Amino acid sequence: MDPGQPQPQQPPQAAQPPAPQQAAPQPPGAGSGAPGGAAQPPGAGPPPAGHQIVHVRGDSETDLEALFNAVMNPKGANVPHTLPMRLRKLPDSFFKPPEPKAHSRQASTDAGTAGALTPQHVRAHSSPASLQLGAVSPGTLTPSGVVTGPGAPSSQHLRQSSFEIPDDVPLPPGWEMAKTPSGQRYFLNHIDQTTTWQDPRKAMLSQMNVTAPTSPPVQQNLMNSASAMNQRISQSAPVKQPPPLAPQSPQGGVMGGSSSNQQQQMRLQQLQMEKERLRLKHQELLRQELALRSQLPTMEQDGGSQNPVSSPGMSQELRTMTTNSSDPFLNSGTYHSRDESTDSGLSMSSYSVPRTPDDFLNSVDEMDTGDSISQSNIPSHQNRFPDYLEAIPGTNVDLGTLEGDGMNIEGEELMPSLQEALSSDILNDMESVLAATKPDKESFLTWL
C-alpha cells in the first residue's frame, strides 16, 4: 500500500461510546510529512485505546536495497571521507616492500644463480638456505664428484654448499670478531668503525671463486681433494683402481662432461669395486674352507677295517655326531671338546659298553658318586680312551679308530649297522649287570 493513500481507521467497538476526540479520515497526502507514517500535531498525544492507527512502512525495502548498492558500487555510494594513508604519519618502511633477498628463506634460489652477498637476516649466517651457490670453497667434494665454483652444475641444491667458517680462519685486515653475551658472533670493522653480523670472510671466498679458473693454488687444492678421495677409496677397497675420476685440464682443473655422466661414472666405479670386494671375500672363504678340511681326519683309509658298535644307546648319539661332522667348526681340533663333560648326555657314554669292569667297581668307594664331578680331576683334553676300556668283554670295538682330534665318524659307514638286530650276548650281559646292582647309593654304578 502506498503512503499517499488514506490510512485505514480501526472501527470503534460497539460496547464503547464514541470518544469526543475521534480521529477523522485523513485526505491523501496528509500523512506524508514523515517517512514512517502520518504527521502528528505537536500537542496531540497518542491515540486512545481502541483507535490505534496501523502504519504500513513502504520504505524499508528501499533502504535495504541502498545498503547493498553501497557495497556493490562503492563509487556511486556516499562513503564518508577518511584520512588518507599518506597523511597518517606512518614510517617510510610501511610503504616500501622488503627486498626479495632480505629474508633467509627467500634467498634460496633453486635455479642456481649466485648473486652478490647482500645484508640478510640476523640469523641468516646459520641458515643453510641463505648461503649462495658461489660461496663454497673450490674443490669441494660433492656426491657427483670433485667440482669447482664456476664449473659446478646448476642443479646442485644449496644445502650442499652450507657451511660455517671456523674461528681459526684469519679475518681480513682491520676486522675483529666478538661475541654477544648470548654467544652470537658479530664483526667489528675498525677502518670504517662499523659493526655487522655478516662474516667478511664469506665475501673473500666469493671473490676467490670468481678467480678460480686462473688461480694456481685453487688448482692445487682441487688436485689434493681428488687425490684424497682416491686414497679413501683405495683404503676401503684394496683393489686395482681405474684412472682418476676427473682428469685435470690445464686451464684450471674444471671438470669435463656433464653432471649426469659424472654420476654414472661414479656409480659404475662403485659397482666394480663392490664386485671386486665380493670376489676377494669369496676367495678368502674358499681358502678358509680348504684349510679347515685339511685339519679334519679322513676316515677313508681306516674305513674298511673297523667294525662299528651296535648298542642300544648308540643310535641317537651317532646321529648327532653324523650331523656335526658336516660342520667344520665343531669337529676341528680343540674347538669342541666333548670329552670334558662327565655329568651330561654328551659324556663318554656315547660309546656305551654292555657292562662295567670288575676292577673298576672295586674303586667305587674311593670316587665321588655325586651328580656333579669337579672338572679339575679330569684332564682338560682327553685324546685317548682309558686303558681299562680295552679289556672290556663282549665287544670287538677297535678303540684306535675312535681316537683323533674330534673323533669324526662318517655317517655312510655307521648308518647301515644301526639297523642290525642286537646280539644275544649283549642282552645277556646287560641283564647280568642290572641284576647285580643294589638300590643303595654306595654300590650304584658310576657311568662313564
From Swiss-Prot:
Highest taxon, organism lineage: Eukaryota
Gene Ontology BP, a term: hippo signaling
Segment forming the signal sequence: none
Domain (WW): residue spans on this chain: 169-202
Biased composition (Low complexity): 257-269
PTM note: Phosphorylated by LATS1 and LATS2; leading to cytoplasmic translocation and inactivation.
This protein's record includes keyword Cell membrane: yes
Keyword entries, A-Z: Activator, Cell junction, Cell membrane, Coiled coil, Cytoplasm, Membrane, Nucleus, Proto-oncogene, Repressor, Tight junction, Transcription, Transcription regulation
GO annotation, cellular component aspect: bicellular tight junction; cell-cell junction; cytoplasm; nucleus; plasma membrane
Role of this protein: Transcriptional regulator which can act both as a coactivator and a corepressor and is the critical downstream regulatory target in the Hippo signaling pathway that plays a pivotal role in organ size control and tumor suppression by restricting proliferation and promoting apoptosis. Plays a key role in tissue tension and 3D tissue shape by regulating cortical actomyosin network formation.
PANTHER family per record: TRANSCRIPTIONAL COACTIVATOR YAP1, YES-ASSOCIATED PROTEIN YAP1 FAMILY MEMBER
Name by which UniProt lists this protein: Transcriptional coactivator YAP1
Gene behind the chain: YAP1
